[in-house]
Amino acid sequence: MKDLSIRIAVVGAGGRMGRQLIQAIEQMDGVVLGAALERSGSSLLGSDAGELAGLGKNGITVNESLDAVQNDFDILIDFTRPEGTLAHLAFCRLHRKGMIIGTTGFDDAGKAAIKQAAQDIGIVFAANFSVGVNVMLKLLEKAAKVMGDYTDIEIIEAHHRHKVDAPSGTALAMGEVIADALGRDLKSCAVYTREGHTGERDPKSIGFATVRAGDIVGEHTAMFADIGERVEITHKASSRMTFANGAVRAAIWISSKESGIFDMRDVLSLDDL
């Protein structure tokens, strides 16, 4: 029998990621779906969340109001958009609910609001919840320390046509890890577009290239290129379930934290390696 002690609310339950999260919760021990939410006016309101996810009826009705399900969940998982996530964050902070944030595209003010809320609740805020991506970030840190000062560094990412922010949060996280390892400020050394006569490449720059096409789930490559050789570290996701499973794993982990902001490196204890 499933341990019902950790009840999870999924925001955006009818979306691609929301349905995968509901499936992941159903498959993982120690958690149960406590609430499923959709935006006001959605045609999915009133639907059974289990049926939406292709699992059959589970008795959880898709709701539009966090107030209505306040007592039905302990941890909220949010992979929506910045403005919605910040509204959900305020609710969770007020009612002392832990939060898993997979939303990307926050500006500096949004990131500051998340850090401030973490004074009162436990938050896992990560650009990518895939175990493989987070192992890749650790590898990038090590590669940058060995090769970064004498190679040209480029980050290439590809996603489906529906993704609305670029570069991806994961690509930016890759850049941050590399820049930090080299003692550089990513805001100062990042190059996001190249067009026309650009001049010679700045050897201290970190370049970004973006592809948006078809149904690509997510592909990320960091290239360390020297004269005569280059090293490429790549992660390719073939299913959103890898992100969903990681997010549910993070929800279990954060349930024991009263406050603080963490990422998947904390959840996976990667800094201990």
Swiss-Prot record:
Enzyme class, first EC level, given as a word: oxidoreductase
Cellular component terms (Gene Ontology): cytosol
Positions of NADP(+) binding: R39
GO molecular function annotations of the record: 4-hydroxy-tetrahydrodipicolinate reductase; NAD binding; NADP binding; oxidoreductase activity, acting on CH or CH2 groups, NAD or NADP as acceptor
Assigned keywords, A-Z: Amino-acid biosynthesis, Cytoplasm, Diaminopimelate biosynthesis, Lysine biosynthesis, NAD, NADP, Oxidoreductase
Pathway(s) where this gene product acts: Amino-acid biosynthesis; L-lysine biosynthesis via DAP pathway; (S)-tetrahydrodipicolinate from L-aspartate: step 4/4
Subcellular location: Cytoplasm
CDD domains from the UniProt entry: DHDPR_N (cd02274)
InterPro entries (UniProt xref): DapB_C, DapB_N, DapB_N_CS, DHDPR_bac, NAD(P)-bd_dom_sf
Catalytic activities: (S)-2,3,4,5-tetrahydrodipicolinate + NAD(+) + H2O = (2S,4S)-4-hydroxy-2,3,4,5-tetrahydrodipicolinate + NADH + H(+); (S)-2,3,4,5-tetrahydrodipicolinate + NADP(+) + H2O = (2S,4S)-4-hydroxy-2,3,4,5-tetrahydrodipicolinate + NADPH + H(+)
Record keyword NADP present: yes
Positions that bind NAD(+): G12, A13, G14, G15, R16, M17, E38, G102, T103, T104, A126, A127, N128, F129
UniProt keyword Transmembrane helix, yes or no: no
UniProt EC number: 1.17.1.8
Positions contributing to (S)-2,3,4,5-tetrahydrodipicolinate binding: H160, G169, T170
Function according to Swiss-Prot or TrEMBL: Catalyzes the conversion of 4-hydroxy-tetrahydrodipicolinate (HTPA) to tetrahydrodipicolinate.
Similarity remark: Belongs to the DapB family.
SUBUNIT field: Homotetramer.
Full protein name: 4-hydroxy-tetrahydrodipicolinate reductase
Native organism: Pectobacterium atrosepticum (strain SCRI 1043 / ATCC BAA-672)
Origin organism lineage: Bacteria, Pseudomonadati, Pseudomonadota, Gammaproteobacteria, Enterobacterales
